[in-house]
């Protein structure tokens, strides 16, 4: 057994006693073997459950199964077509009814309105963050217009711009601008003073301070605003096309849904709705997911 007792040291020339010396010793590390679940190999089911894409596909499959069962139980195709009938109508719409071209028509208008709203949101947020009057301006405008449904502006859009693409872009900008600007401004104002002071201590200033510190710190809220704005844009676009009928002289997804409802092709109505859902899933899980992985997840800001 190692003696760990301390030996006193003699007095120093100044009359002070030096601290005691502890004898050196070594401890031998013994292997303990596997510890709990650390060394246990994962089962095939556990490995599959760790795949995010597979879990989401299982959720979609469960929804499709419940849809099919509920439609078969109701047995009324005019009210609720089955999933298989809707899938067949979707394929038929792609092959013969130009569903993809209609989807692209709607998507192109949506992207234009979304881009205009994004530019305006950046300008408004920049003014709001920089000046007090800008902050009051953004706060007042969002309080006024954010609760106002975009669909309520349809009569004004029809009166000012007529039936066409400009009217659709007008209501899209209204639908996207306010939630996007509100989330972006909230992201910048939520950056802590400690983080701001740390950036200044590192010599950051001007545009470098904004790009290097403020935007990354506020980006989770900005990304949330982009997602919310995208969802609002789709809702507004489909509702507007149901009223306008066409955009730029061509029918969009809203027109496809409206026309088939009038002709009682309910399976094609559901096919149009499924197309909107599929585009939304694609954008959410590809575009926004890519942005999230290469920004906030890479920076360790979200799990």
Regions found by a protein language model. Name each.
Residues 112-142:
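Transmembrane-helix boundary motif in ABC transporter permease subunits
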Residues 41-49, 72-116, 255:
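Periplasmic/extracellular loop-to-transmembrane helix junction in inner-membrane transport proteins
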Residues 170, 174, 207-240, 271, ...:
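Transmembrane alpha-helices
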Residues 143-179, 186-187:
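Generic hydrophobic transmembrane alpha-helix motif, especially the helices
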Residues 159, 237-266, 270, 275, ...:
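Glycine-rich helix-loop "coupling/hinge" segments at transmembrane-helix boundaries
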């Amino acid at each position: 057994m190692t003696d760990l007792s301390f030996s006193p040291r003699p007095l120093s020339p100044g009359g002070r006693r030096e601290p005691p010396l502890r004898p050196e010793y070594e401890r031998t590390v013994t292997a303990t073997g596997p510890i709990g679940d650390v060394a246990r190999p994962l089962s095939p089911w556990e490995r599959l459950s760790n795949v995010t894409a597979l879990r989401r596909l299982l959720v979609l499959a469960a929804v499709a199964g419940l849809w099919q069962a509920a439609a078969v139980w109701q047995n009324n195709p005019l009210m609720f077509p089955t999933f298989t009938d809707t899938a067949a109508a979707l394929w038929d719409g792609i092959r013969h009814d130009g569903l993809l071209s209609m989807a692209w028509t709607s998507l192109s208008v949506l992207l234009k309105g979304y881009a205009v709203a994004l530019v305006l949101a950046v300008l408004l947020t920049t003014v709001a963050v920089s000046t007090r009057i800008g902050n009051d301006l953004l706060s007042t405008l969002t309080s006024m217009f954010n609760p106002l449904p975009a669909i309520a502006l349809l009569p004004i859009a029809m009166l000012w711009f007529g039936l066409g693409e400009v009217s659709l872009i007008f209501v899209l900008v209204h639908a996207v601008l306010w939630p996007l600007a509100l989330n972006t401004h909230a992201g910048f104002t939520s950056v802590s003073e400690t983080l701001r002071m740390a950036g200044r201590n590192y010599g950051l200033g001007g545009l470098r301070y904004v790009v290097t510190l403020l935007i990354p710190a506020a980006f989770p809220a900005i990304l949330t605003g982009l997602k919310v704005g995208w969802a609002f844009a789709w809702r507004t676009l489909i509702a507007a096309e149901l009223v306008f009928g066409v955009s730029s002289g061509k029918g969009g997804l809203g027109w496809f849904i409206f026309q088939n409802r009038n002709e009682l092709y309910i399976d094609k109505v559901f096919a149009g709705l499924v197309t909107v859902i599929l585009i939304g899933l694609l954008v959410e899980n590809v575009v926004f997911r890519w942005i999230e992985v290469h920004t906030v997840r890479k920076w360790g800001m979200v799990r």
